[in-house]
């Protein structure tokens, strides 16, 4: 064995002795180094020991006689854990000594201080005992953890008859890395709250609690399912309340595809055919019911007369012609009625003056040639006295309004007897709807001696009057729908062009236009009609339109080549100049398609195009 003096520690082995002259060598304890090696090698050689023990078990015989009679003692446990356990026990002993010393000090304090409350004493003792108990528990848990980790690292026993005299360590209170615990609560806090609420609801006994039993009978489902089916199409009368109803009624409703069979596709009718059908229809259709309705409306004549005598004007509206009704009321009933009433009043006053019937002036508003100056001249001849007509005004401007103002000032001081009945047919007519005409009539209605009886056909006729005109008229509205035909009113308009624009001319008007054009223009128009009819024939009967549209037109460049081939137009400029006449009379249209190419097409039906080819363009 070598002594400890023979081992010397060097700071630098490779250094020279000169460098280490001033350095004193350090002594190393070989026994302490051996202990450290022993601690580190215990874990390192663990697998080697386990393999050796397994080999020894295989080599040993299973004969029980060879086994030792006396039980072998457990080998000494090597390693660091014993030292750790000893240190922990020493700490526990120190803590117990400290607690005993603290208790002795408190007893001395109690003897010295006699004024301390009993409640504070007991509370302090409890706190101290709790602290010491917590410390003891923590130290015990540390000891148990240390022992379990140590036993896990120890090699297994090879001898079958080995019996350990040491008591088994208790299970650790806190789970370690090696220990497995199965008692885990995986319920989330939210689930725990829900379960607690359900438990409280289950335990609560309320008088209105719903209890279901086997005898529970559900509500029967109605058999008539049509009562509860919601209609796909909403009716016009059903809408929401409040402001939502406003938007619900005015929302855009997507309707089904429009029908191709519109009134524009209807065949054209000649004037002779129209007059024949309309005359027969107007005379015979619902003739007796219309007469009965007229007799019922006549019973309101006294009411109308009373309203006129009280200073009101009458305005009649409704479906049908009101011309015969107004003339019969004004001429046959109102004029003699007012005359006889005035005669009776004068007889009471014993005034022997001849009384003639009240004059009636009828204005035909449906006549476009009606002029307000001519109307005012007729009124002044009937109402204005001679002294007013002699003094002419020298003012520039509208003399009609100045003359009416003189009449208003004159008749303010006259008796309120009606001296003129002014009947206006179609107050919303094309000539009377002008502002000057409406202003003149509104000023005339201010005069109480003039009774105005008028009629309107358009539903928006009151929009012609502003606030001042409406106050001057002072109308009372009456509905007299009599469904009479407007035979006289329609004579001042072209019935065949009703519903069409003023500039457009039909196939009948195209005949007169073609007669006044040159032969070259007629050939060009005939070629256009023939190419369009060919395009209309190529389309199927279901999808093809019955009237010429952009879809059935001809490209301008292609049509230019066709005209050049037939020696009609040599270039595009000449072709455009020839087409200008047809475009102005709405006999042809030029538009651009989606690709930007110009298309020429004739806006007539297939039958009209055939008719033009057979009549006017047949000789070409």
From Swiss-Prot:
Key word Phosphoprotein present: yes
Disordered: annotated span: 1-184, 204-225
GO molecular function: chromatin binding; DNA replication origin binding
Primary location: nucleus
Chain positions with Phosphothreonine modification: 60, 187
Miscellaneous comment: Present with 1700 molecules/cell in log phase SD medium.
Function: Component of the origin recognition complex (ORC) that binds origins of replication. It has a role in both chromosomal replication and mating type transcriptional silencing. Binds to the ARS consensus sequence (ACS) of origins of replication.
Assembly, per entry: Component of the origin recognition complex (ORC) composed of at least ORC1, ORC2, ORC3, ORC4, ORC5 and ORC6. Interacts with MCM10 and TAH11.
This protein's name: Origin recognition complex subunit 2
């Amino acid at each position: 064995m070598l002594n400890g003096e023979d081992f010397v520690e060097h700071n630098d082995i490779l250094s020279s002795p000169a460098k280490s002259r001033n350095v004193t060598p350090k002594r190393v304890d070989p026994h302490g180094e051996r202990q450290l090696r022993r601690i580190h090698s215990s874990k390192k050689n663990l697998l080697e020991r386990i393999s050796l023990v397994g080999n020894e078990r295989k080599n040993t015989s299973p004969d029980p006689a060879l086994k030792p009679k006396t039980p072998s003692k457990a080998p000494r446990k090597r390693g660091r854990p014993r030292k750790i356990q000893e240190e922990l026990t020493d700490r526990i002993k120190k803590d117990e000594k400290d607690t005993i010393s603290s208790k002795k000090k408190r007893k001395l304090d109690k003897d010295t201080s006699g004024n301390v409350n009993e409640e504070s004493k007991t509370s302090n003792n409890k706190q101290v005992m709790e602290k010491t108990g917590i410390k003891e528990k923590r130290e015990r848990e540390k000891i148990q953890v240390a022992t379990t980790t140590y036993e896990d690292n120890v090699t297994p026993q090879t001898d079958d008859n080995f019996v350990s005299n040491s008591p088994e360590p208790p299970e650790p209170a806190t789970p370690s890395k090696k220990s497995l615990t199965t008692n885990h609560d995986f319920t989330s806090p939210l689930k725990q709250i829900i379960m607690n609420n359900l438990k409280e609801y289950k335990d609560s006994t309320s008088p209105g609690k719903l209890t279901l039993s086997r005898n529970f009978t559900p509500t029967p489902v109605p058999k008539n399912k049509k009562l509860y089916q919601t209609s796909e199409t909403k009716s016009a009368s059903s809408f929401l309340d409040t402001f939502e109803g406003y938007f619900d009624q005015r929302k855009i409703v997507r309707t089904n595809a429009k029908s191709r069979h519109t009134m524009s596709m209807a065949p054209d009718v000649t004037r002779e055919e129209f007059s024949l059908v309309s005359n027969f229809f107007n005379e015979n259709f619902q003739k007796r019911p219309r007469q009965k309705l007229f007799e019922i409306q006549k019973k309101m004549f006294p009411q109308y007369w009373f309203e006129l005598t009280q200073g009101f004007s009458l305005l009649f509206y409704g479906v049908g012609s009101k011309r015969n009704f107004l003339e019969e009321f004004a001429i046959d009933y109102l004029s003699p009625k007012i005359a006889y009433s005035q005669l009776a009043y004068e007889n009471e006053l014993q005034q022997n003056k001849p009384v003639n019937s009240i004059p009636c002036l009828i204005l035909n508003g449906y006549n476009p040639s009606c002029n307000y100056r001519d109307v005012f001249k007729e009124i002044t001849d009937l109402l204005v006295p001679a002294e007013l007509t002699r003094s002419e005004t020298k003012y520039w401007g509208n003399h009609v309004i100045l003359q009416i103002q003189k009449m208003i000032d004159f008749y303010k001081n006259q008796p309120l007897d009606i001296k003129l009945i002014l009947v206006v047919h179609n107050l919303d007519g094309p000539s009377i709807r002008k502002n000057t005409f409406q202003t003149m009539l509104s000023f005339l209605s201010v005069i109480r001696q003039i009774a105005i009886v008028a009629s309107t056909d358009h539903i928006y006729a009151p929009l012609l009057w502003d606030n001042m005109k409406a106050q001057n008229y002072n109308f009372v509205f009456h509905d007299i729908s009599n469904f009479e035909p407007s035979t006289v009113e329609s004579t001042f308009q072209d019935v065949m062009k009703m519903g069409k624009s003023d500039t457009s001319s039909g196939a009948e008007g195209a005949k007169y236009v073609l007669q006044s054009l040159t032969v070259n223009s007629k050939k060009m128009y005939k070629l256009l009609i023939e190419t369009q009819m060919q395009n209309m024939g190529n389309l199927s009967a279901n999808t093809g339109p019955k009237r010429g549209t952009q879809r059935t037109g001809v490209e301008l460049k292609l049509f230019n080549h066709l005209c050049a081939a037939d020696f009609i137009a040599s270039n595009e400029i000449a072709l455009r100049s020839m087409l200008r006449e047809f475009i102005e009379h709405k006999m042809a249209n030029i538009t651009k398609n989606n690709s930007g190419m110009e298309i020429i097409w004739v806006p007539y039906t297939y039958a009209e195009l055939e008719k033009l080819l057979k009549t006017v363009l047949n000789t070409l």
